[in-house]
Amino acid sequence: MSEANDSKVNLDVPEHLEYSDEHVWVDSSVEPAMVGVTEYATEQFGELVYIDLPEVGTQVETGDEVAEFESSKAVTALVSPVAGTIRYVNNEAADDPSIVTDDPYGEGWIFKIELEDDEPDLLSADEYAKIVAD
């Protein structure tokens, strides 16, 4: 596991995932692929109070805003790093947004998507760790 070193916090960056520079992770080793936000993103959010999830069946393109996170600090859009069709959404995370903060790489996933492209253009764990370390 890579770690992004910050003077205040060490963040987990699991090596088996791929990342966008928008702080979204993708696990394309499972079908449909799983998508969520990184630990770094959850640190930036502060306390999440509401998550607006996409609808199952929605076709998304890379770069589309597909979900919204409302926190004590701001409302932030989740920008999809991949194109495809949303197959599942994590209603448990919508019901209790703290799941995303507490376990962003596990129970806090946001949606599962059937990918259009078998090889999306994403960052490795090491590449992403360098971005958040800067």
Residue ranges with predicted function:
Residues 18, 52, 70, 75-80:
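Small beta-strand-rich domains/subdomains or short beta-sheet motifs embedded
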Residues 41, 74, 94-95:
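A short acidic/small-residue loop/turn micro-motif
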Residues 2-65, 98, 102-134:
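Acidic, low-complexity mobile loops and tails
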